[in-house]
Amino acid sequence: MKPANEIELSEVIRGANGPLRIVGGGTRAIGPLNAGEVLETGALSGISLYEPGALTIVAGAGTPLSEVEAELAKGGQRLPFEVPDLRGLLGRDGASTIGGVVSANAAGPRRIQAGACRDSLIGVRFVDGVGTIVKNGGRVMKNVTGYDLVKLLAGARGTLGVLTEVAFKVLPRPEVEATLTLDGLDPTAAVTAMAQALGSPFEVTGAAYLDGQVCLRIEGMAGSVAYRSAALVKLLGAGWDVADAAHSAKLWSEIRDMTPFVGKPGAVWRISVKPSDMPQVLATLNEAQTLCDWGGGLIWARVPDVNDAQAVTLRACLAALGGHATLVRASDSVYATTPAFHPEPAGLAALSASLRAKFDPRGILNPVGMG
């Protein structure tokens, strides 16, 4: 099913007799695909408003991300949160949609400075599980529902409603960027260096650690970037190299899109943890290739795709640390016994169930979309 507009979508959901699997570009699904009839949002497409002076863009949920980014580039602007393209990692085709970005609350390396997708999202329209059309945020800021639906819909993976339109605040594109790199650091030294850089006044917009190398990005006007890069090197000590804009852009696109893992076998974990706990988590993993982003707060790990892909050991470690792990890629045999999404604590699970009962009382929208 591919409804042509919001009214048709409402009618489809209202008349549904079973589960619906919501598909945008089909590029960000995690774990086994949901059962149910496919409901495509691709026809809910198009940029309805772009006001560069107001730093605002509004688009249909089915609008290709590339179309949104191209329009913003014409105005010298961009989405603040640096959307990852994980098609290579996940082995997916298709074109990512802006609604899919919101549903996954996708965010790349710049999250440490600009926030996640939900932090730039200012308005949504969606159809809930009984076919009601709902609008929240944007130009109508009064919240009459008692819920901050803008924040709730970001990251809900379609379990609370089918997005039809999204509105974002956007930011100017920086003039240049540069990246400081230092090789030969162990995880503890890497976390210390990244924390020192992120705690400085020099506005670091990327802090990653891979293959023993720490990478720190600075963006802005040319003069400012040159000054801040030099000042950061002075703060951190000798030995740092400074990559120019072209090399910096290539490096961070590879970090953002997980290029080091593309084409390599294995299960892949996406782990969220306090940056200071990064070394302990890395020590827990066996035979793992890792890439750490967000100053150590996000760990990507490629491990052997056998048994439970180290789920029991990893999640036990994270339970003690207050972190969580999502199995974003694995074989069917691993997924058969290992939930893709981290088990929720009892209180959070009850809250999630209550929200789903409110917005989708029949439980038909992406019924296993969150594990």
Give the residues covered by each predicted segment.
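N-terminal glycine-rich flavin-associated loop
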Residues: 1-20, 41-92, 102, 106-139, ...
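Short secondary-structure junctions
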Residues: 17, 198-203, 285-287
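Glycine-rich beta-strand-to-loop/alpha-helix junction loops that act as flexible
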Residues: 21-28
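Conserved glycine-rich FAD pyrophosphate-binding loop
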Residues: 32-35, 239-371
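Short acidic-glycine loop/turn motifs at beta-strand connectors
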Residues: 34, 52-53, 128-130, 210-212, ...
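Residue-level signal for inorganic ion chemistry
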Residues: 62, 216, 301
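Short, conserved charged micro-motifs
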Residues: 66-68, 187-192, 223-230, 277-285, ...
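C-terminal substrate-binding/cap subdomain adjacent to the FAD-binding core in PCMH-type
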Residues: 103, 122-265
